[in-house]
Regions:
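Primary recognition of RNase H-like, Mg2+-dependent phosphodiesterase/nuclease domains
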Residues: 1-140
Length: 140
């Protein structure tokens, strides 16, 4: 689980778009071969599924980050819509990040990483993406 924030958002939709983009960048950094992205925003999920940047369902402000998401996630292109109730954990985590301004927390509780450095934490320890701040990384 990764908690991060960005200051380039002006609406919940834009926040969701930038969250998808950041997830794609993390997936690339971790060199994931497969992946799925979850969103509770149905129009965004439909646009991502169609991979149509000119889809009028979504605000024009989303087109640049969505375009970048498409470029980065071409092999990880599965975006699923989930209900807002199902997405409660992500919603709560987002509010935790907004309410806390502490140093980043990196932790691993995987038993398979007990005797070796966690490869996920090692990969993300110095990972920086312009416009984003990582607040927590928990390898579960």
């Amino acid at each position: 689980m990764i908690q991060a924030s960005t200051h380039v958002v002006c609406s919940p939709l834009i926040a969701e778009v930038y969250a998808l983009l950041f997830a794609a960048k993390i997936s690339c950094r971790l060199q994931l071969q497969q992946g799925s992205f979850l969103t509770d925003n149905l129009p965004l999920a439909k646009m991502a599924a169609s991979r149509d940047i000119n889809n009028t369902i979504i605000s024009w402000r989303c087109r640049q980050p969505i375009s970048e998401f498409f470029q980065i996630s071409h092999s990880l292109n599965v975006v699923y819509h989930i209900s807002r109730n199902t997405n409660g954990i992500a919603h709560n985590c987002a509010h935790q990040v907004l309410n806390s301004r502490v140093e980043p927390v990196f932790s691993c509780s995987r038993s398979s990483h007990a005797n070796v450095p966690c490869p996920f934490l090692q990969s993300l320890l110095n990972f920086q993406v312009q416009g984003y701040v990582i607040h927590a990384v928990h390898c579960l």
